[in-house]
């Protein structure tokens, strides 16, 4: 299945997330944005992470990337060289890695990783590394509070590097936000992309308001972005509504 993995297609068919949002996220991942998935305890968190990682491997526009798993039992040391990272984990090797050849798979960002490892893993995002991150947090404000607090004490600019943030429960995506990197002293609030309305049993979709940002972050003009999004929608088996 070109450009979209079978696991992602299955999540859409199960109703875990909508096809338009899945297509948008897959394009943003192709462009190098990080993806962060939040939940307290839910197998869906890892399923979503694995599905988008598989989709990134399918992308014809993205070259091969080594997936480096940053987990609670791994102790990483990162080199200061801005063109590469060094991992003291024997499974990942110790040679510096280019930004273009690495995908970090960060698990246990809050309450799992050793604080120093978590800080350095997030700091690497500002240096251009891409990551798919799983974090134990009920929502985005709680994640920010945990990352600001002791022992992590991450600066605000690092918090804005988390890319697309999904909040999930055991069955579906409940909310999605797009974060915006700081520009100088200017910090933009997160953009709400979708929110699950439990009383109506449907998602409230706000991605239409973020289309210019999607195209800009993907380094495309709007027409090209819309065409690629339409193609992904077709692959996912759902006609585009916009």
Model-assigned labels for residue ranges:
Residues 42-44:
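ATP-binding Walker
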């Amino acid at each position: 299945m070109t450009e979209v993995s079978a696991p992602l297609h299955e999540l859409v068919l199960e109703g875990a997330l909508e096809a338009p949002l899945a297509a948008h996220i897959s394009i943003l991942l192709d462009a190098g944005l990080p993806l962060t998935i939040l939940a307290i305890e839910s197998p869906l968190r890892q399923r979503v992470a694995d599905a988008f990682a598989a989709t990134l491997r399918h992308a014809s526009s993205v070259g091969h990337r080594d997936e480096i798993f940053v987990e609670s039992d791994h102790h990483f040391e990162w080199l200061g060289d801005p063109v590469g990272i060094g991992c003291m984990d024997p499974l990942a090797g110790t040679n510096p890695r280019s930004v273009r050849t690495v995908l970090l798979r960060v698990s246990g960002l809050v309450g799992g990783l050793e604080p120093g490892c978590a800080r350095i893993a997030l700091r690497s995002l500002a240096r251009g590394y891409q990551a798919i991150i799983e974090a134990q947090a009920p929502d985005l404000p709680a994640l920010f509070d945990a990352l600001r607090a002791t022992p992590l004490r991450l600066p605000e600019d690092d918090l804005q590097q988390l890319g697309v943030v999904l909040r999930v429960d055991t069955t579906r995506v409940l909310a999605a936000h797009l974060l915006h990197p700081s520009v100088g002293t200017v910090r933009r609030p997160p953009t709400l992309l979708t929110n699950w309305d439990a009383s109506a049993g449907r998602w409230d979709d706000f991605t239409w308001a973020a289309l210019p940002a999607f195209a800009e972050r993907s380094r495309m003009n709007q027409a090209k972005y819309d065409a690629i999004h339409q193609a992904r929608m077709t692959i996912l088996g759902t006609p585009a509504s916009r």
